[in-house]
Amino acid sequence: IIVGYRDNQLFLKEDLEENGTVYIATEDGSVGTKGNVMNAIEENALQADVIFACGPMPMLRAIKKYAEEKEIKAYISLEEHMACGVGACLGCVVKTKEVDHHSHVHNARICTDGPVFDAEEVEI
Protein backbone atom coordinates (compact mmCIF):
# COMPACT_ATOMS: atom_id res chain seq x y z
CA ILE A 1 0.00 0.00 0.00
CA ILE A 2 1.49 3.30 -1.10
CA VAL A 3 0.06 6.63 0.02
CA GLY A 4 1.11 10.19 -0.60
CA TYR A 5 0.65 13.26 1.57
CA ARG A 6 1.76 16.89 1.46
CA ASP A 7 3.39 16.81 4.90
CA ASN A 8 3.43 14.89 8.18
CA GLN A 9 -0.31 15.37 8.74
CA LEU A 10 -1.05 11.71 8.03
CA PHE A 11 -4.53 10.23 8.10
CA LEU A 12 -5.78 6.64 7.76
CA LYS A 13 -2.25 5.33 8.37
CA GLU A 14 -3.29 2.93 11.15
CA ASP A 15 -6.30 1.72 9.17
CA LEU A 16 -4.15 1.04 6.12
CA GLU A 17 -1.52 -0.78 8.20
CA GLU A 18 -4.18 -3.33 9.18
CA ASN A 19 -4.20 -4.43 5.53
CA GLY A 20 -0.48 -4.64 4.79
CA THR A 21 2.82 -2.82 4.66
CA VAL A 22 2.37 0.90 4.09
CA TYR A 23 4.88 3.00 2.15
CA ILE A 24 4.50 6.74 2.63
CA ALA A 25 5.62 9.60 0.43
CA THR A 26 5.39 13.22 1.54
CA GLU A 27 6.00 16.20 -0.69
CA ASP A 28 8.15 17.87 1.97
CA GLY A 29 10.00 14.68 2.96
CA SER A 30 8.88 14.88 6.60
CA VAL A 31 7.72 11.23 6.57
CA GLY A 32 8.83 8.39 4.31
CA THR A 33 10.04 9.08 0.80
CA LYS A 34 10.39 12.70 -0.26
CA GLY A 35 8.23 13.31 -3.29
CA ASN A 36 5.16 11.49 -4.54
CA VAL A 37 3.94 7.92 -4.75
CA MET A 38 5.95 7.31 -7.90
CA ASN A 39 9.10 8.26 -5.99
CA ALA A 40 8.12 5.78 -3.25
CA ILE A 41 7.59 3.03 -5.82
CA GLU A 42 11.03 3.64 -7.32
CA GLU A 43 12.89 4.15 -4.03
CA ASN A 44 11.51 0.95 -2.54
CA ALA A 45 11.69 -1.07 -5.78
CA LEU A 46 8.06 -2.07 -5.28
CA GLN A 47 6.44 -4.61 -7.56
CA ALA A 48 2.80 -5.52 -8.06
CA ASP A 49 0.55 -7.81 -10.05
CA VAL A 50 -2.24 -5.24 -10.08
CA ILE A 51 -2.55 -1.56 -9.14
CA PHE A 52 -5.58 0.20 -7.69
CA ALA A 53 -5.16 3.97 -7.60
CA CYS A 54 -7.08 7.08 -6.66
CA GLY A 55 -5.83 10.61 -6.38
CA PRO A 56 -5.09 13.69 -8.43
CA MET A 57 -5.06 13.42 -12.22
CA PRO A 58 -1.27 13.96 -12.61
CA MET A 59 -0.64 11.01 -10.30
CA LEU A 60 -3.16 8.83 -12.12
CA ARG A 61 -1.47 9.66 -15.43
CA ALA A 62 1.89 8.65 -13.96
CA ILE A 63 0.42 5.42 -12.56
CA LYS A 64 -1.20 4.62 -15.92
CA LYS A 65 2.10 5.18 -17.75
CA TYR A 66 4.05 3.13 -15.19
CA ALA A 67 1.54 0.27 -15.40
CA GLU A 68 1.72 0.26 -19.20
CA GLU A 69 5.53 0.25 -19.18
CA LYS A 70 5.69 -2.58 -16.62
CA GLU A 71 2.73 -4.46 -18.14
CA ILE A 72 0.80 -4.35 -14.87
CA LYS A 73 -3.00 -4.34 -14.80
CA ALA A 74 -4.19 -1.05 -13.29
CA TYR A 75 -7.54 0.29 -12.18
CA ILE A 76 -7.97 4.00 -11.53
CA SER A 77 -10.71 5.82 -9.69
CA LEU A 78 -11.54 9.07 -11.46
CA GLU A 79 -13.01 12.19 -9.90
CA GLU A 80 -14.92 14.86 -11.73
CA HIS A 81 -17.51 17.51 -10.96
CA MET A 82 -20.84 15.77 -11.32
CA ALA A 83 -23.75 18.13 -11.89
CA CYS A 84 -26.49 15.51 -12.01
CA GLY A 85 -24.90 12.26 -10.82
CA VAL A 86 -27.10 10.13 -13.09
CA GLY A 87 -25.37 10.51 -16.45
CA ALA A 88 -27.84 12.89 -18.08
CA CYS A 89 -25.76 16.07 -18.17
CA LEU A 90 -22.55 14.48 -19.55
CA GLY A 91 -20.53 16.83 -17.35
CA CYS A 92 -18.27 14.06 -16.12
CA VAL A 93 -17.26 12.25 -19.29
CA VAL A 94 -13.86 10.72 -19.84
CA LYS A 95 -12.55 9.74 -23.26
CA THR A 96 -12.32 6.00 -23.82
CA LYS A 97 -10.78 3.70 -26.39
CA GLU A 98 -14.07 1.89 -27.01
CA VAL A 99 -17.06 3.44 -28.78
CA ASP A 100 -20.19 3.61 -26.65
CA HIS A 101 -22.86 1.65 -28.52
CA HIS A 102 -25.61 4.00 -27.37
CA SER A 103 -24.03 7.37 -28.19
CA HIS A 104 -21.48 6.19 -30.78
CA VAL A 105 -18.73 8.32 -29.20
CA HIS A 106 -15.58 7.52 -27.30
CA ASN A 107 -16.85 8.65 -23.90
CA ALA A 108 -17.81 7.09 -20.60
CA ARG A 109 -19.64 8.85 -17.81
CA ILE A 110 -17.65 8.79 -14.59
CA CYS A 111 -20.82 9.02 -12.47
CA THR A 112 -22.58 6.00 -13.99
CA ASP A 113 -19.93 4.00 -15.85
CA GLY A 114 -17.29 4.48 -13.14
CA PRO A 115 -15.78 5.92 -11.12
CA VAL A 116 -13.32 3.02 -11.34
CA PHE A 117 -11.98 2.22 -14.80
CA ASP A 118 -9.44 -0.14 -16.29
CA ALA A 119 -6.53 2.24 -16.93
CA GLU A 120 -6.04 0.77 -20.40
CA GLU A 121 -9.57 1.73 -21.42
CA VAL A 122 -9.52 5.46 -20.63
CA GLU A 123 -7.50 8.31 -22.04
CA ILE A 124 -6.45 10.66 -19.28
Regions picked out by a protein language model, each given a short descriptive name:
Residues 57, 79-115:
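Local cysteine-cluster metal-coordination motifs and their immediate loop/turn environment
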Residues 1-81:
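FNR/FR-type flavoprotein reductase catalytic core
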